[in-house]
Amino acid sequence: MPNKVHVKKGDTVVVISGKYKGKQGKVLTVLPKDKKVVVEGVNIVKKHVRPNPKMPQGGIITQEAPIWACKVMLVCPKCGKPTRIGHRFIQEGEEERKVRACKKCGEIID
């Protein structure tokens, strides 16, 4: 059974617990196997890089590290509030498509 994560790349999320509680950012990467996400501006770490063809000098770089997906909540684009996600089926021609919807205002997210 595949590991599912409730957010997708490009979603705006808010961190709901931990050191970065209340911070808002965009999802840069989703790691479904680890159940983690990388959020822009959250969990910044310094990484020591050895000299290589890309960086002949080497050095210390700062980048975002993954956090647990359960620690973030999707921000609804319409109401602008952190919300849980529900699913709906919408009719497209003869086929039904499953879409995400805001639990607070009912707006379809994607």
Curated annotation (Swiss-Prot):
**What Pfam families does the record tag this protein with?**
KOW, ribosomal_L24
Q: Which GO terms describe its cellular component?
A: ribonucleoprotein complex; ribosome
Known SMART domains for this protein?
Answer: KOW
Q: Which GO terms describe its biological process?
A: translation
Q: Where is the signal peptide?
A: none
* Entry superkingdom: Bacteria
Could you state a single Gene Ontology molecular function term? structural constituent of ribosome
Q: Which keywords describe this protein according to UniProt?
A: Ribonucleoprotein, Ribosomal protein, RNA-binding, rRNA-binding
User: What does the annotation say about its assembly with partners?
Assistant: Part of the 50S ribosomal subunit.
This molecule's function is given as: One of two assembly initiator proteins, it binds directly to the 5'-end of the 23S rRNA, where it nucleates assembly of the 50S subunit.
Give the record's family classification.
Belongs to the universal ribosomal protein uL24 family.
Q: Cite the HAMAP family for this sequence.
A: Ribosomal_uL24_B
Name of the protein described by the UniProt record: Large ribosomal subunit protein uL24
Which taxonomic lineage does the organism of this UniProt entry have? Answer: Bacteria, Bacillati, Bacillota, Bacillota incertae sedis, Caldicellulosiruptorales
